[in-house]
């Protein structure tokens, strides 16, 4: 008989093992009776329908759903005292006792409660203990101690201990199972009842339901149907963000293991798919979200859910399943606070007969809004059937919370949410209670007003406290702010006065560094609707020639974003020339060679701005005062740039002078008062660079390349041995305003001296020529680094390419072996003298031989000589190397004396002697310990030589040998491992 049942049971793997994963697999394995399989249909029933039990222990119709079905007036309930890590117990009890169906059944057990005795510890009925605990929470005004439950913890679960942290879902399953056993013990032959009958207990009728499992063969499309009893649904939330997504994943069709299902039609193992559906929904649906894994980790993601759920789309296609109500409402839940299942805290949330929710945190009870309930990271949720929604069609079932509880027979007004009118509001609303859960006479009216406000504003909020009746004035104020907003300095609109003040503050801090446009252009910018998109200001062009004339095309850019990183002064300026007063390139100018009169007119307005109470005012009077000053500066600068155009004779000088002019003219901040007090120079006489008097000395503002020239001049002074005066600004060949050319300097000038120095005329008689390795900072007469780059090579960077000037580099012209010979020949010297001598020797050898083959032979010979010299140097270093503790030095007596032939390589007599003392510590026949102090040991032998002859007498060979060894070691000598017998005889 068992053999005939194997194919049928192979069709469906047990539910906990088939849909298990890392989350919650342990709890499913611990409760094998949680879900049972029914593969034996009644002989007279359809095999595709749920079988009917032979006996019903408690009818399903006797379960009273909802708080209104009981004659008792239900209270909120008190908290429960935590007696030591019992938060899991308190939270589970609070969640169970706030389920209306379970609470109504416990209260109805008055007859059994009178006959059952629960006073004895470790015995009694757990159902009566639950009923008394429920009555205690309803009657007391303070927190109760659930001692009737935790005193029977061993009866509920054997491995649970009071005071230890446990899992709330595990305790829930064992508690419900214990209550079922207690109910079955009322019947005499309960052990003989089949599984279908045992599932008809009150606990089975409240929490129990049936799932239809359909396994479809992919080869012959044969469908095998089985039914499974369940009391909770374990939903995987790893790939779900809401409760509906978790339901979709649980009831979706999944593929079984390939070739792992034995089909009844094919009679072989094939691939198949499996899908669950609701055959009979439970009255109270218990949902556990798989937040814990096997190793104790917790998945703390937020799972959104609604207070009402509809499971109609997951119902089976059978007529009985389609006719049942599948709309549920939230009644209670258990939450877990913590990072893992081994630590944390459990709390509970329960509903009352008024429809409000309360949070139960051990002994603390406080009301909680529906919005906070839905935002809670739930662990266990209890939903109960909503029979009030079962009468209406599924399409007309609203998802929001009703204003009434829905279980009374009183008619609902048409203005409430349950009305099927077109203006019906769908969504969560407040129940007809106040903030603390107490009803008032205006609750229903207030809810209707909230609904109208929601329809006007287009918002749907869950609670009335979030509704705002003053939104039209706020909207009007916001529109007014938008209308009156003006463009700020960055081109964006802002209605906040703080942003305007902050932008003005930034402009005040930067007014002495940055050019500011004129008032007329500011007015034009405000009148014209410029673009509001952010644009970067034009930066100074450091690569183009500033002396080339370009087309005058003034471009006005509406963006007025100041540069936020101005260059600060590195020198304490106390006076400045007019040529350094030119500001930074204006963002309104797109090129360097635009109309300079416009640029200077804008820069002249920089001094026209004044600070008034921390704000920048562009006064017309202050701007008109400096009009003549701006015109004079314009004429002077025009003459300056005309002279610069005439003095530009080469491309290298132009490229070098252009960035320095910009640095001198644009990037040095100047004080406004000093620049205003200085009179403009004559247009015919170009101004010279400024000489500044400060506390540290006299400073001269020049360009960076002039500093390099002065450094080179210092070198020239050392070579020539004659003092050189510092050139005055009028005679400096680097002066950008000088009309003379740099090539017309007299030989006495530092530039001529440096030219002679680099050409080699003055260098031949004083010092050795410099070796140009491409990394020295010496520059040529034109002050450019391009000539140094021309001498460098691209060797080692891939294919051979030309140098900077398009010709092969100087290093590439020489053979590679010769270059290596030059480098190796000068390897051994630290001071560098050998390098020069080796290079000179190689050059002399190369110049003496004109043939290329001779050059290669010479190079090879030099390589061999250099290698031999390096080997000789290395040998000398090894001989002269001092001992730094890296090599162990061992003294040995084998190298001298008559025992040289008996020495062993690597033998260390000191190590053997020290080790022998430790090895023979307790040896020697007499049992006396050998002391490490040899002097003490010697005295010991002298004092005890007459008591017993331990060493065979004073004249024995062993005693004499040890004494000789001590004298030999004290003298600093060594010894071999074994002494010859002839020497021992001589000692004796």
Swiss-Prot record:
CDD domains: Peptidase_C19E. Residues 532-544, 602-631, 735-747, 762-782 have a biased composition (Polar residues). Residues 31-48, 408-422, 490-509, 669-679, 892-903, 930-943 have a biased composition (Low complexity). Its EC number is 3.4.19.12. Residues 16-55, 393-422, 483-782, 868-988 are annotated as: Disordered. Residues 78-386 form the USP domain. The active site is at residues 87, 345. Its main location: nucleus. Residues 592-601, 650-659, 707-717 have a biased composition (Acidic residues). GO terms for cellular component: cytosol; nucleolus. Residues 632-649 have a biased composition (Basic and acidic residues). GO terms for biological process: germ-line stem cell population maintenance; negative regulation of macroautophagy; protein deubiquitination; proteolysis; regulation of apoptotic process; somatic stem cell population maintenance. The keyword Transmembrane does not apply. Residues 680-689 have a biased composition (Pro residues). Keywords: Hydrolase, Nucleus, Phosphoprotein, Protease, Thiol protease, Ubl conjugation pathway. One of its GO terms (molecular function) is cysteine-type deubiquitinase activity. The modification Phosphoserine is found at residues 419, 421, 575, 577, 650, 682, 688, 746. It catalyses: Thiol-dependent hydrolysis of ester, thioester, amide, peptide and isopeptide bonds formed by the C-terminal Gly of ubiquitin (a 76-residue protein attached to proteins as an intracellular targeting signal). It comes from the Eukaryota. Interacts with atms/PAF1, but not with CycT. Required for maintaining multiple types of adult stem cells, including male and female germline, epithelial follicle cell and intestinal stem cells. May function as a transcriptional repressor by continually deubiquiting histone H2B at the promoters of genes critical for cellular differentiation, thereby preventing histone H3 'Lys-4' trimethylation (H3K4). Controls selective autophagy activation by ubiquitinated proteins. Belongs to the peptidase C19 family. This is Ubiquitin carboxyl-terminal hydrolase 36. The gene is Usp36.
């Amino acid at each position: 008989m068992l053999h005939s049942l194997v194919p049928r049971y192979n069709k469906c793997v047990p539910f906990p093992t088939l849909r298990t994963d890392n989350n919650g697999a342990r709890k499913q394995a611990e409760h094998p009776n949680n879900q049972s399989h029914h593969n034996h249909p009644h002989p007279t029933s359809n095999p595709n329908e749920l079988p009917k039990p032979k006996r019903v222990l408690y009818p399903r119709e006797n379960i009273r759903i909802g708080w209104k079905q009981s004659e008792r007036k239900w209270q909120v309930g008190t908290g429960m005292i935590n007696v030591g890590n019992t938060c899991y117990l308190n939270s589970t009890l609070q969640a169970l006792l706030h389920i209306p169906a379970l609470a109504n059944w416990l209260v109805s057990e008055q007859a059994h409660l009178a006959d059952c005795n629960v006073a004895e510890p470790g015995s009694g009925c757990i159902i009566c203990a639950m009923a008394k605990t429920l009555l205690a929470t309803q009657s007391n005004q303070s927190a109760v101690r659930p001692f009737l439950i935790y005193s029977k913890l061993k009866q509920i679960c054997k491995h649970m201990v009071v005071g230890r942290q446990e899992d709330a879902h595990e305790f829930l399953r064992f508690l419900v199972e214990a209550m079922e056993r207690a109910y079955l013990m009322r019947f005499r032959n309960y052990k003989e009842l089949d599984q279908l009958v045992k599932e008809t207990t009150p606990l089975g009728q409240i929490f129990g339901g049936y799932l239809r499992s359909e396994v479809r063969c992919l080869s012959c499309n044969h469908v095998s149907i089985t039914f499974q009893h369940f009391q909770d649904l374990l939903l995987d939330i790893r790939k779900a963000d809401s409760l509906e997504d978790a339901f979709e994943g649980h009831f979706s069709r999944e593929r079984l293991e390939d070739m792992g299902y034995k089909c009844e039609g094919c009679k072989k193992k094939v691939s198949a798919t499996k899908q669950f559906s609701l055959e009979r929904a439970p009255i109270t649906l218990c949902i556990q979200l798989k937040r814990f894994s096997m190793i104790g980790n917790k998945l703390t993601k937020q799972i959104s859910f609604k207070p009402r759920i509809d499971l109609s789309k997951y119902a089976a296609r059978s007529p009985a399943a389609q006719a049942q109500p599948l709309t549920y409402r939230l009644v209670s839940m258990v939450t877990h606070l913590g990072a893992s299942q081994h630590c944390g805290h459990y709390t509970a949330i329960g509903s009352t007969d008024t429809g409000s929710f309360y949070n139960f945190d051990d002994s603390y009870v406080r009301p909680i809004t529906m919005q906070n309930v839905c935002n809670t990271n739930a662990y266990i949720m209890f939903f109960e059937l909503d029979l009030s929604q079962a009468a209406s069609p599924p399409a007309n079932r609203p998802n929001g919370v009703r204003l009434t509880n829905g279980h009374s027979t009183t008619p609902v007004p048409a203005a409430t949410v349950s009305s099927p009118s077109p203006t019906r509001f769908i969504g969560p609303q407040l129940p007809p209670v106040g903030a603390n859960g107490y009803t008032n006479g205006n609750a229903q009216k207030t809810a209707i007003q909230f609904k109208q406000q929601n329809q006007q504003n287009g918002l749907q909020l869950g609670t009335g406290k979030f509704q705002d009746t003053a939104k039209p004035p706020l909207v009007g104020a916001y529109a007014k702010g938008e209308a009156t907003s003006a463009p700020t300095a960055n081109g964006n609109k802002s209605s906040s006065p703080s942003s305007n003040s902050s932008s003005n503050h930034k402009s005040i801090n930067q007014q002495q560094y940055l050019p500011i446009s004129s008032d007329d252009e500011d007015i034009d910018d405000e009148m014209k609707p410029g673009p509001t998109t952010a644009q970067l200001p034009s930066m100074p062009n450091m690569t183009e020639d500033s002396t080339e004339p370009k087309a005058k095309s003034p471009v006005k850019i509406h963006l007025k974003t100041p540069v936020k990183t101005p260059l600060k002064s590195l020198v304490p300026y106390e006076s400045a020339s007019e040529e350094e007063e030119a500001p930074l390139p204006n963002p309104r100018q797109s090129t360097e060679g635009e109309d300079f009169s416009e640029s200077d007119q804008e820069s002249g307005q920089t001094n026209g701005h004044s600070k008034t109470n921390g704000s920048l005012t562009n006064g017309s009077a202050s701007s008109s005062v400096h009009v003549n000053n701006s015109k004079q500066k314009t004429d002077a600068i025009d003459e300056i740039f005309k002279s610069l155009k005439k003095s530009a004779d080469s491309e290298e000088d132009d490229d070098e002078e252009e960035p320095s002019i910009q640095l001198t003219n644009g990037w040095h901040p100047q004080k406004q008062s000093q620049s205003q007090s200085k009179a403009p120079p004559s247009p015919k006489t170009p101004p010279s660079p400024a000489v500044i008097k400060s506390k540290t000395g006299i400073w001269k503002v020049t360009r960076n390349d002039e500093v390099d020239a002065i450094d080179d001049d210092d070198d020239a002074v050392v070579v020539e041995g004659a003092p050189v005066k510092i050139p005055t600004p009028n005679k400096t060949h680097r002066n950008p305003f000088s009309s003379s050319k740099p090539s017309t300097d007299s030989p006495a000038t530092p530039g001529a001296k440096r030219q002679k120095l680099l050409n080699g005329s003055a260098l031949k008689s004083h010092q050795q020529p410099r070796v140009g390795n491409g990394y020295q900072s010496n520059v040529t007469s034109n002050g450019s680094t391009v000539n140094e780059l021309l001498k460098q090579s691209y060797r080692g960077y891939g294919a051979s390419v030309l140098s900077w000037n398009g010709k092969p580099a100087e290093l590439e012209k020489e053979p590679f072996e010769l270059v290596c010979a030059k480098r190796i020949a000068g390897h051994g010297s630290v001071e560098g003298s050998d390098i020069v001598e080796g290079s000179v020797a190689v050059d002399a050898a190369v110049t003496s031989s004109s043939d290329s083959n001779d050059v290669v032979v010479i190079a090879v010979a030099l390589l061999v000589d250099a290698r031999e010299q390096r080997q000789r140097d290395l040998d000398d270093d090894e001989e002269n190397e001092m001992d730094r503790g890296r090599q162990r030095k061992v003294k040995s007596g084998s190298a001298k004396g008559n025992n040289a032939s008996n020495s062993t390589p690597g033998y260390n007599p000191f190590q053997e002697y020290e080790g022998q003392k430790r090895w023979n510590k307790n040896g020697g026949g007499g049992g006396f310990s050998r002391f490490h102090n040899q002097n003490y040991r010697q005295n010991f032998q002298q004092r005890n030589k007459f008591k017993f002859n331990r060493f065979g007498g004073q004249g024995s060979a062993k005693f004499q040998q040890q004494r000789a060894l001590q004298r030999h070691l004290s003298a600093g000598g060594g010894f071999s491992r074994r002494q010859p017998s002839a020497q021992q005889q001589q000692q004796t």
